[in-house]
Amino acid sequence: MEQVIHRDQTYCVPSRSLVDNIYLIRDVLEVSGSLGLQTGLISLDQEKAFDRVEHGFLWETMRRFGFGEGLIAKIQVLYSDIESVLKINGSLCAPFRVCRGVRQGCALLGMLYALSLEPLLQKLRLCVYGLVLPGFRNNMVLSAYADDVVVFIKDQQDVTVLTKITEKFSALSAARVNWGKSEALAVGEWSAPSSPSRSFLEERWF
């Protein structure tokens, strides 16, 4: 997993911890505040994250990451022929096939979810400018622990790119960002031309 999942995703990857995310966010806030850096943090709320994992998308993602067909087939067995029923007005409806979601209690749940989300995170790393600290060449774009994803932005352009990428990913994977529950924080000295529009998160800047 550590060879496939980028180091900024710490969920269910050996030698990584939620503590890494906490320290990173803390340091970004402290450094941005003390140096007056133009930094924005957007915490994405994934709507019913684990329940919206599309099985077909997950299998194809695993293939693209180089997992063998034998391993994929074994995992598919665990998720094949799953049915569910709904109870409506005291009566059970006819069973229907379940084609989404990673199973609660499954030992592979965390790893499968991290794999399903990694294509989105890869695209964000490539396209969002993020934060570059003085003295460092590499930019920091995000911090993720499972579906808890915080994206670092530099200006309105980053916000525009972020929204477009999440919309395209939703169309491909069935994942969905709930912008009404997402949060954002502006730190440092923002210049008027580059300040993100507050309307994109329904005035949820705080």
Predicted segments, located by residue:
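Nucleotidyl polymerases of mobile genetic elements and RNA viruses
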Residues: M1-F206
